[in-house]
């Protein structure tokens, strides 16, 4: 059993620890000066934040390129290659962030041993918040790509209707899309239909794009699945983190008000002391004058 007499002797300091924790929660990376281990930790946090910003910019760029390709009936190979390169960059950034988050994740043994440590809880808070941001961003990217897939399928469906191939049902269309082979997909469309070469080329291009997109979605999903599960399990902790941060900001604000009031009170107290000192001096002076006059008389 652990010797906790030292903790009992410092029972009065528990509220001070809580106050320190509140302050630690709102410390911005780079502003703390707590020693080498913490400097190294905050440097890693800064790196993760920067990588998340890069990922966010790439996702935004991906969205723009997808809109451009959707608006182009027959996108050039260079456009499709640029889009695929962007997807590859996003996947690599996702892997980098996952590894970086793993590097700052508090070890279970360390967390259990130092559960009441302000430093440990601060590290868990930072890791939880960054993980949540990463998962939300990847979810957004996956949702965006899923919507892009549906729009490509809709373009194929529209082309089939225009070329009198509208007898292909949605179920049959999905089965052809799932075939994974553009040749099989195109040959199925050609059966008993009159499809123009331009329409056929667009349908084939859309199908190829859908195949690449589905591979990208699967790979991206695999990158963050473990982290999404962890964040989901820590959902309650994330909510507590948000609550702690908000209460910390309120605590700091109230602390500033208290300091302001204390300074005002201190100023008033000084004025009172000066006033009392002047009154006493005048009283003593009057007494001295009275005594001197009495002596002369």
Swiss-Prot record:
Where Phosphoserine occurs, residue numbers?
14-15, 36, 117, 208, 248
Which residue ranges does the record assign to the t-SNARE coiled-coil homology domain? 200-262
Instruction: Note the subunit structure.
Output: Component of the SNARE complex composed of STX4, SNAP23 and VAMP7 that interacts with SYT7 during lysosomal exocytosis. Found in a complex with VAMP8 and SNAP23. Detected in a complex with SNAP23 and STXBP4. Interacts with VAMP2. Interacts with SNAP23 and SNAPIN. Interacts with LLGL1. Interacts (via C-terminus) with CENPF. Interacts with DOC2B. Interacts with STXBP6. Interacts with STXBP3; excludes interaction with DOC2B and SNAP25. Interacts with STXBP4; excludes interaction with VAMP2. Interacts with STXBP5L.
Query: What is this protein identified as?
Result: Syntaxin-4
PTM-bearing positions, type Phosphothreonine: 31
CDD domains in UniProt? SynN
Compositionally biased residues, Basic and acidic residues: 1-12
Q: Which residues form a coiled coil?
A: 43-163
Stretches for region Disordered: 1-21
Gene coding for it: STX4
Check the UniProt entry and state the signal peptide residues, or none: none
User: Per the record, what ranges lie on the membrane's Cytoplasmic side?
Assistant: 1-275
Keyword hit for Transmembrane helix: yes
Give the location in the cell: Cell membrane; Cell projection, Neuron projection; Cell projection, Stereocilium
Q: How does it sit in the membrane?
A: Single-pass type IV membrane protein
- Site (Required for neurite tip localization) found at 290
Q: Which GO terms describe its cellular component?
A: caveola; endomembrane system; neuron projection membrane; plasma membrane; SNARE complex; stereocilium
- Predominantly, its location class is membrane
- The stretches that face the Extracellular side, renumbered to this chain, are 297
Q: Which family does it belong to?
A: Belongs to the syntaxin family.
* Species, as recorded: Bos taurus (Bovine)
- Output the lineage of the source organism: Eukaryota, Metazoa, Chordata, Craniata, Vertebrata
Spell out the Gene3D superfamilies in the cross-references.
Answer: 1.20.5.110, 1.20.58.70
Record function comment: Plasma membrane t-SNARE that mediates docking of transport vesicles. Necessary for the translocation of SLC2A4 from intracellular vesicles to the plasma membrane. In neurons, recruited at neurite tips to membrane domains rich in the phospholipid 1-oleoyl-2-palmitoyl-PC (OPPC) which promotes neurite tip surface expression of the dopamine transporter SLC6A3/DAT by facilitating fusion of SLC6A3-containing transport vesicles with the plasma membrane.
């Amino acid at each position: 059993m652990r010797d906790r007499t030292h903790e009992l002797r410092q029972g009065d300091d528990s509220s001070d620890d809580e106050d320190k924790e509140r302050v630690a929660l709102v410390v911005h990376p780079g502003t703390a000066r707590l020693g080498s281990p913490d400097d190294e930790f905050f440097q890693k946090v800064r790196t993760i934040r920067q990588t998340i910003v890069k990922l966010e910019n790439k996702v935004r760029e991906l969205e723009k390129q997808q809109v451009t390709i959707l608006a182009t009936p027959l996108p050039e190979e260079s456009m499709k290659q640029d889009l695929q390169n962007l997807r590859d960059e996003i996947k690599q950034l996702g892997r980098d962030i996952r590894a970086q988050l793993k590097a700052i994740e508090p070890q279970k043994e360390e967390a259990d041993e130092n559960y009441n440590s302000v430093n440990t809880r601060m590290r868990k808070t930072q890791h939880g918040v960054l993980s949540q941001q990463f998962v939300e961003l990847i979810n957004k990217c996956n949702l965006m790509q899923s919507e892009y897939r549906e729009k490509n399928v809709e373009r194929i469906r529209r082309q089939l209707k225009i070329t009198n191939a509208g007898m292909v049902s949605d179920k049959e269309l999905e089965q052809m899309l799932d075939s994974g082979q553009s040749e099989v997909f195109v040959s199925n469309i050609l059966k008993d239909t009159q499809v123009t070469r331009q329409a056929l080329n667009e349908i084939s291009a859309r199908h190829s794009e859908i195949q690449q997109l589905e591979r990208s979605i699967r790979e991206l999903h695999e990158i963050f699945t473990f982290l999404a599960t962890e964040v989901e399990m820590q959902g309650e902790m994330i909510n507590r983190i948000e609550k702690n941060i908000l209460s910390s900001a309120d605590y700091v604000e109230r602390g500033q008000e208290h300091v302001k009031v204390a300074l005002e009170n201190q100023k008033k107290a000084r004025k009172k002391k000066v006033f009392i000192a002047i009154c006493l001096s005048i009283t003593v002076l009057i007494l001295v004058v009275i005594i001197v006059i009495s002596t002369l008389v």
